[in-house]
A protein has these predicted regions:
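DNA breakage-rejoining catalytic core of tyrosine-based enzymes
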Residues: 293-307
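Short, solvent-exposed beta-strand edge segments and adjacent coil->beta transition regions
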Residues: 105-109, 155-158, 295-297, 364-366
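Hydrophobic "lid/gating" helix adjacent to the active-site nucleophile
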Residues: 125-141, 279-282, 313-358
Length: 371
């Protein structure tokens, strides 16, 4: 268990008295720890246990050997129609309603300074697309049901153009909002803006139906590894993926249809009730009847002293900084609305299986937290 902690936290070693959160742990890393402990050690572990007993010795002592073997995710028959995951079905439905919307585009812009080996970059993207089926998947409707089709691996189109600093942000935004065609694909767009001979901006855009924030991080990390090798004339072999996203989608459907769907529906209906309250904040203007997805962001920095104080308070209370800040946010909503029943949706990684850690795909889900 100490070795699992050390690997996931990125530290050399973990001692019996070490605290998971003091070593830099957070809820996403905690999820990976629990999945590893369950599947590799066959021990009954939970996120709640890790939060209640964050010190290694106490956490390990509270674990019990499970009699339920963790089943593996089987590989789907690629000769049969490949169903969508439940998350993909939501995205497919939303895209059919608003195919021109960019609300579910996932962008990333990387500044590349220094000499760029474009051939190595091309080879890196080609390797990524060959490695991850989601990067070459499109979607279709047949007989009233939706399916995903994995296409053969082909060379990625990298759109190259010369550009200057002036208007750069606007150009990137224009690239990001270009609509995707989920029926034709591809659902990964790559643009390379050359600002100077040794200065480029790499713009990556994916549709949410094949990706999420975790996936974008995986893609960038693997892109860096591949480019580092190819640019030096080396062959790069990344660890083999145990499954692909289509395998997960089929496994998820089988799992839910075996009784899990009814259990979860009963739980959430009992917790949230039938009617969901609408948060009525004192806006300057009336809420539109239809969401436009137009909005703005206000960024600001927290002082180092405040951040350290938040972390210290969270550790004393046996919680995470996220939970502490969420409680503060909900208190603020109560102050402005006067409503006692406030529900907040927060994204969860939803990758509680070891096989899914390095996959590019749409796993993230929104979980309702009730005050």
């Amino acid at each position: 268990i100490a070795a699992i902690w050390a690997e996931i936290l990125g530290v050399e070693r973990v001692g019996l008295d070490d605290n998971f959160f003091e070593l830099g742990g957070h809820s996403l890393l905690a999820t990976r720890v629990i999945s590893r402990v369950r599947q590799e050690q066959q021990l009954d572990a939970s996120l709640k246990a890790l939060f209640e007993r964050p010190v290694l010795e106490a956490f390990a002592q509270g674990l019990e050997r499970t009699t339920d073997a963790v089943s593996t995710i089987p590989l789907a028959d690629r000769q049969q129609p490949l169903a969508l995951s439940f998350a993909q079905e939501r995205q497919w439905f939303l895209w059919q309603l608003e195919p021109e919307s960019a609300a579910y585009h996932i962008p990333s812009a990387l500044r590349l300074r220094g000499r760029l080996d474009v051939d190595a970059l091309q080879r890196s993207f080609d390797s990524l697309v060959a490695r991850h089926e989601t990067l070459r998947t499109r979607f279709r409707l047949e007989g009233g049901r939706s399916y995903q089709q994995v296409q053969p691996a082909v060379s990625v189109s990298i759109e190259r153009e010369q550009f200057g600093e002036e208007g750069l942000i606007e150009r990137i935004q224009a690239i990001v909002v270009q609509p995707f065609d989920l029926e034709r694909g591809p659902l990964l767009r790559v643009n390379l803006l050359q600002l100077a001979e040794d200065d480029h901006v790499l713009v990556l855009v994916q549709h949410h139906i094949v990706s999420d924030g975790w996936s974008m991080q995986v893609m960038v990390e693997e892109l860096v590894q591949l480019y580092a090798g190819y640019s030096q004339g080396l062959d790069v072999v990344l660890p083999a993926l145990p499954i692909q996203y289509a395998d997960y989608a089929l496994w998820q459907r089988s799992w839910m249809e075996a009784g899990e769907k009814e259990r979860q529906l009963a739980y959430w209906t009992g917790l949230l009730g039938g009617e969901q309250p609408v948060l009525e904040l004192p806006f300057d203007r009336p809420r539109p009847a239809r969401q436009s997805h137009r909005g703005a962001q206000l960024g600001f920095e927290l002082s180092r002293e405040l951040v350290e104080a938040v972390r210290a308070l969270a550790q004393r209370e046996g919680t995470s900084s996220f939970m502490l800040l969420l409680a503060s946010f909900q208190a603020l909503l109560y102050r402005y609305s006067g409503q006692a029943d406030i529900r907040v949706g927060v994204p969860i990684a939803n990758r509680n299986r070891v096989e899914t850690e390095r996959l590019i795909g749409f796993f993230v889900n929104t979980q309702v937290l009730k005050r």
